[in-house]
Amino acid sequence: MVEVRVPATSANIGPGFDCLGVAVNMYNKFFVEEIEEGLIFEGCADKFKNENNLIYVAMKKCFDKIGYKPTGLRIKIESDIPVSRGLGSSAACVVGGIVSANELAGGALNKKELLDLAVEVEGHPDNVNPAFCGGMTASISDNREVIYSKVKVSEGIKFCALIPDFTLSTEKARAVLPKSIDYKDGIFNVGRTALMISALNNGDFHLIKYACKDKLHQDYRAKLIENFYSIKKQCEKLNSLGVFLSGAGPTIMVMLREEDKDFSKNIKSFLETLKNKWEVRELKIDKLGTVVNNCKV
């Protein structure tokens, strides 16, 4: 049996639309073994127990590339990453599927080939890269090749995810974005993306609140998330370092100083006054990324 653990990811980090992403310590685990025949799923809803399951789709893509044909598969899922909340649940399934398939087939593909294949299936390198490699990454796709670099994050920072009880599909969140942007808005984001990376690198945490600003996606998507601005304002009042939409949303991610012990209980009290229910979850950066049989890929 192959055991694969994949972390949740938070993409964009404010201005770094479709390029920045960070892995956090919330995980999906996949236990996969080859059986004599059939396709058996455990740990997921009945509607996902078929060949359209994203984990199986990713596995088949890997098997086809290698030229391996399993006799049958048993796939058990232990999921801690909420679906359609902007925390990289799709990327976790794709990476978990591809890596487990490669292990079953004898490890025919190297790390670079696995990464390129995962991005081909999932489509978002800003989620796939940190899920695969851990830490924070800056990623691009160049002629179908995935290029990325690790972003050094100074010690002393943690994250807090505010996770609502409602979902928001990536497709719906993409549909509200404009077809084109003003030149000045592009410049606005380029500058703040550079500032974000530099501030995290150098421990200039007081600059993060400026770096979190963005003109490419967050304001458009905020309209789909009830109370987004009131929550953001309250987070700022509680001395957060920065607040941004996690991926396409609806989860709101907050950056905090490591020593901040009061934020979670205080924001929880505020969120309890709102109509929707929100889970408050403090998180740390996952530095390992995908782990196979307790070993880093």
Swiss-Prot record:
Belongs to the GHMP kinase family. Homoserine kinase subfamily. InterPro entries: GHMP_kinase_C_dom (IPR013750), GHMP_kinase_C_sf (IPR036554), GHMP_kinase_N_dom (IPR006204), GHMP_knse_ATP-bd_CS (IPR006203), Homoserine_kinase (IPR000870), Ribosomal_Su5_D2-typ_SF (IPR020568), Ribsml_uS5_D2-typ_fold_subgr (IPR014721). The lineage of its organism: Bacteria, Bacillati, Bacillota, Clostridia, Eubacteriales. It comes from Clostridium botulinum (strain Hall / ATCC 3502 / NCTC 13319 / Type A). It is found in: Cytoplasm. One of its GO terms (biological process) is threonine biosynthetic process. Keywords: Amino-acid biosynthesis, ATP-binding, Cytoplasm, Kinase, Nucleotide-binding, Threonine biosynthesis, Transferase. GO terms for molecular function: ATP binding; homoserine kinase activity. This is Homoserine kinase.
